[in-house]
């Protein structure tokens, strides 16, 4: 990455962190205003604006990093998704374990502490989905056609535009939520079948990929489960379960991962036979 691009990358990362910090501060003040019955409230617009900007700048930073990466090793790219996923889910589960430990203490009812930890969880989730999205994008665009490239460009724009749904109060089970998220999921499903990279893996690499993708799916499901649990048990200013953008991203990651698993499994026998025949030819020569 050149110095100019690195500067943009650092700016995006810095802005995403700054938006997250301001979002946390405003949410804590909102909670305090409700508890103390203070009449001065921060308009919800600013909360959703900061949340949206945090999402946007995080995604732009990973987009820039992915576009300038020269790594062509597909297995290493899957490792990148897994390692960042493992790192984020470890801290997320640690937060959950910490809340479990203090469950019978006075801290368990501290709404400030709960929301601080929840905002840390938001940051971890955004990092995971942004990294996974752009790694899968890069892999799916391997040996791309012009149509595939345009289709992915449209999908990426639709994904980023879905961030604007933060400004609307959409319930997870509501019809507007389904109407907005359903086309994104269907579009993601169609794009997920462009898996030319699978053919360039040998038998051993395919098994490693199957293991890594399975773990990525488990990480995604664990994050979604935590989002649901926090929605049911905690009082939150920002609730991710009603966030079209985040839930659509998890839908894309799980769909893309599941289809990749199926394709890898179906390609295992052909890889084994090809490598065996290739070995016989080399011995004969």
Give the ranges of each region predicted by the language model.
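Hydrophobic transmembrane alpha-helical segments in integral membrane proteins
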Residues: 9-18, 36-53, 118
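Short hydrophobic alpha-helical membrane-embedded segments
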Residues: 12-21, 151-158
């Amino acid at each position: 990455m050149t110095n100019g691009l690195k500067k943009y990358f650092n700016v995006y990362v810095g802005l995403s962190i700054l938006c997250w910090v301001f979002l946390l501060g405003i949410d804590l003040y909102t909670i305090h205003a409700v508890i103390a019955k203070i009449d001065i409230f921060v308009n919800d617009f600013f909360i959703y604006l900061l949340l949206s900007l945090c999402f946007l700048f995080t995604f732009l930073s990973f987009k820039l990093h992915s576009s300038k990466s020269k790594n062509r090793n597909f297995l290493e790219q899957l490792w990148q998704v897994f390692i960042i996923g493992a790192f984020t889910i470890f801290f997320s589960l640690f937060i959950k374990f910490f809340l479990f430990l203090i469950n019978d203490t006075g801290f368990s009812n501290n709404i400030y502490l709960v929301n601080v930890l929840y905002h840390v969880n938001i940051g971890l989730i955004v990092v995971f989905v942004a990294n996974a999205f752009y790694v899968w994008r890069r892999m799916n665009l391997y040996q791309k056609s012009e149509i595939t490239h345009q289709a992915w460009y449209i999908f990426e724009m639709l994904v980023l535009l879905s961030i604007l749904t933060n400004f609307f109060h959409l319930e997870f089970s509501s019809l507007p939520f389904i109407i907005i998220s359903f086309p994104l999921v269907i579009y993601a499903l169609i794009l997920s079948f462009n898996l030319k990279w699978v053919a360039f893996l040998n038998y051993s690499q395919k098994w490693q990929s199957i293991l890594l993708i399975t773990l990525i799916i488990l990480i995604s499901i664990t994050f979604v489960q935590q989002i649901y649990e926090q929605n049911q048990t905690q009082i939150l200013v920002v609730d991710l379960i009603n966030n079209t953008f985040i839930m659509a991203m998890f839908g894309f990651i799980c769909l893309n991962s599941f289809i990749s698993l199926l394709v890898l499994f179906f390609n295992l026998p052909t890889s084994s036979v090809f490598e065996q025949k290739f070995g016989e030819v080399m011995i004969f020569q």
